């Protein structure tokens, strides 16, 4: 379970909520797994080059990257989209470059055991606005 922090990157958080409501993230595959560093998903083609249409404007977040931080994957400024990653450890070189979307609040041990090709389903938790 990861908690989206809309105050940190409000435009990105809004886009992610809309994609979740539309069902975009149903059965998404982790296409990139680097043990001890990061797992990445959000590409419906599962190869790392796809995503939702369009791109998101970059938002700076000074939040540090620690175990379980969820960040926006980028290929450069204003290139964010539906791909996101979760880090396994302290990664200070990502802070201020990749917007932070939230943190894993439950199941970090599961996150640490994810293998390439494992899938996830993102949905709104009960009690969240629909």
Spell out what each predicted region is.
Residues 1-130:
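Cyclophilin-like peptidyl-prolyl cis-trans isomerases
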């Amino acid at each position: 379970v990861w908690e989206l922090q809309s105050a940190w990157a409000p435009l990105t958080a809004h886009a992610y909520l809309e994609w979740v409501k539309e069902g975009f993230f149903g059965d998404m595959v982790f296409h990139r797994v680097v043990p001890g560093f990061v797992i990445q998903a959000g590409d419906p083609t599962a190869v790392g080059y796809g995503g939702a249409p369009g791109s998101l404007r970059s938002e700076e977040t000074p939040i540090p990257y620690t175990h379980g931080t969820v960040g926006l994957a980028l290929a450069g400024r204003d290139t964010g989209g539906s791909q996101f990653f979760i880090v396994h450890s302290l990664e200070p070189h990502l802070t201020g470059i990749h917007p932070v979307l939230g943190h894993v609040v439950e199941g970090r041990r599961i996150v640490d055991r994810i293998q390439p090709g494992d899938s996830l389903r993102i949905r709104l938790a009960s009690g969240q606005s629909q």
